[in-house]
Amino acid sequence: HTRPELMDGQNVAAHTWRTVVILHTLWPDVSKNCLLNMLYHDVAEAETGDMPATTKWRYPELNELMARVERDYENSIGVGDTVYKVTDDERAMCDIADKLELVFHCYRLMQQGNTLANDVFLKGVGYLQEKYLEKEFFEPVKEILNALTSEYHKPPRLQVTLEQFSNL
């Protein structure tokens, strides 16, 4: 994650491992190519750098250009879509796993008191719901997002404790 306030020591290897675990946990029957696609999904960042997801969301035309540059680089080193072909649904599942890992990461930061993660958390949830809500394979993700967002809207435990003390 490229925003310094959200990094918390996470690197591309840790992010990638988590995305592969999320992908395989949610959809254990995905193809080997899909798993390999997920494994290599951020390898181009070694060449291009990593643009924050929020910037990609804000500037779709820049996102399209970066996607093309990354795709060209991946294909030049033999790890791109031309090598590991995936279906449109599998590509969507990889995107979901990638964004869900971001949501989980931000959720953990928020639990630690990092309020700077709130905006990215909510944008990540919104992105997933807006783009994939109608897809049948999105069902398990809906449950996860519902659980995370219902927990997000609860007041922090410290706030509840202080309110209980003030009522004594």
Annotate each language-model stretch with its function.
Residues 1-168:
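Alpha-helical, largely C-terminal catalytic domains
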